[in-house]
């Protein structure tokens, strides 16, 4: 689920923290991608006649097709992806997982009724609700990535937390996931829609955590408490406190404990056995990989290995797989060139007030020298 309503709240309260870019803007960038989120997207979206793709043996192949072609697309644009797979879910997530099981059981009943009534649209809708990423899906995608020469990381716990840790350690530029809790886990940069279908034509949304906190007027600990109030996978929320009220209360009282001491508990009852402290600890000190010992290597694809796995075993078209392997090999060279801004380090900065003063003085001098001729326009590279 991530954090309920966080993206909209940021758009409303801290819109300057969100930038929109085309995929071409990420040439030379290393990005940690939430693998489970991607695989789930592929199982939902990569379909034929409303059903997941299958080979002649009845094995699902939607995840492999999605992983193969979306990864090639990123590499063709000079992006170096590293996929991060979920480990064991934290104990605190058991309540959320139980709710998901209940929703699946309900969807199964509704699917059965839709099939009996011959309701095609509802059959497709409820089939999608039953989609679940399995261990086999994960293992097959890991095998595929290895053959493609793309690194992956097995997170000890939540993938988003390890993605965030890799960004904080400087191993990658950003965490790519649809789950907003990557920000709560502390990723400095979050990318949404990076692995979305090209047909959707969605711009990539880039969220900057420091700007979010600056414009909201909160510290990271206060931001975590705000996310807990909005609703996460790890504990319940206080009923009646929506996003607007939550941020107002955090700004006023600074922590959940202070909020609880100052609100009308009859109007806003606290959940029984509320685990907000444990949720806070999980966000602030999650179980993640040792980033220092984590080596990320992008190597040449194994074309023959890809053909053996994807064609002989999974029954994909050999021409298409070989063509994809050649694209990987060709574009791997391009993505190793890196970005210009990797070679230049900013040694200092000036405040926005000072910058405006400098710019206004500079423009005044320029006008005097050029006798008011229009200045040329330029775009500063990123």
Swiss-Prot record:
CDD domains per the UniProt record, alphabetical: H3TH_FEN1-Euk, PIN_FEN1
A GO MF term: 5'-3' exonuclease activity
Binding site for DNA: 47, 70, 158, 231, 233
Stretches for region Disordered: 352-382
Domain of life: Eukaryota
Region annotated Interaction with PCNA, chain positions: 336-344
PTM entry text: Phosphorylated. Phosphorylation upon DNA damage induces relocalization to the nuclear plasma.
Free-text comment on the cofactor: Binds 2 magnesium ions per subunit. They probably participate in the reaction catalyzed by the enzyme. May bind an additional third magnesium ion after substrate binding.
Binding, Mg(2+) 1: 34, 86, 158, 160
GO terms under biological process: base-excision repair; DNA replication, removal of RNA primer
Compartments (UniProt record): Nucleus, Nucleolus; Nucleus, Nucleoplasm; Mitochondrion
Cellular component, GO, one term: nucleolus
Segments for region (N-domain): 1-104
Cofactor: Mg(2+)
Subcellular location, principal: nucleus
One Pfam family here: XPG_I
Key words, A-Z: DNA damage, DNA repair, DNA replication, Endonuclease, Exonuclease, Hydrolase, Magnesium, Metal-binding, Mitochondrion, Nuclease, Nucleus, Phosphoprotein
Function of the molecule: Structure-specific nuclease with 5'-flap endonuclease and 5'-3' exonuclease activities involved in DNA replication and repair. During DNA replication, cleaves the 5'-overhanging flap structure that is generated by displacement synthesis when DNA polymerase encounters the 5'-end of a downstream Okazaki fragment. It enters the flap from the 5'-end and then tracks to cleave the flap base, leaving a nick for ligation. Also involved in the long patch base excision repair (LP-BER) pathway, by cleaving within the apurinic/apyrimidinic (AP) site-terminated flap.
Record note on quaternary structure: Interacts with PCNA. Three molecules of fen1 bind to one PCNA trimer with each molecule binding to one PCNA monomer. PCNA stimulates the nuclease activity without altering cleavage specificity.
Assigned protein family: Belongs to the XPG/RAD2 endonuclease family. FEN1 subfamily.
Name of the protein in question: Flap endonuclease 1
Organism: Xenopus tropicalis
